[in-house]
């Protein structure tokens, strides 16, 4: 079984580590930084466990490998889930749009705060992830941004 939390509250970060652009940044996914997300992972795990135990499926499903049937407390389950957790979302929100440069990267017209002539036009400006594929939202962001760029160029 596989499942993903579509509305996580945890927020990661990307930090510049050197003035040289060739030096990789520090990426902290912080996947379970918020207790709410850990609780949702536990709920999903327990749901999968109950589905696997359903009489119609039980004959076709082998023994639970991780964390094992003996693990029944949050303290026993969470460390095992942490070994398997990964981000299932397309990356969004790394350059969030907003009005305040202290907690956002771009303004409402996709312009990077404090840097003239630079815009970001992709899903990284979306402050929260969408509950689905990002292709459509990416095209919508690009379409609207193109219109704004043309408006700004015309004066």
Give a label for each model feature.
Residues 1-137, 145-155:
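FAD-dependent oxidoreductase catalytic-site/capping-region signature
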């Amino acid at each position: 079984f596989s499942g993903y939390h579509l509305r996580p509250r945890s927020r990661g970060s990307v930090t510049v580590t050197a003035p040289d652009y060739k030096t990789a940044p520090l990426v902290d996914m912080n996947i379970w930084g918020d207790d709410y997300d850990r609780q949702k992972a536990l709920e999903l795990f327990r749901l999968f466990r109950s589905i696997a135990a359903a009489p119609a499926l039980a004959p076709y499903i082998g023994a639970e490998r991780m964390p094992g049937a003996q693990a029944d407390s949050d303290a026993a389950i969470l460390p095992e889930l942490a070994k398997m957790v990964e981000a299932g979302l397309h990356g969004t929100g790394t350059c969030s749009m907003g009005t305040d440069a202290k907690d956002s990267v771009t303004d409402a017209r996709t312009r990077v705060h404090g840097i003239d002539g630079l815009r970001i036009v992709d899903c990284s400006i979306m402050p929260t992830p969408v509950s689905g594929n990002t292709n459509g939202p990416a095209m919508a962001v690009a379409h609207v941004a193109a219109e704004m760029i043309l408006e700004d160029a015309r004066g």
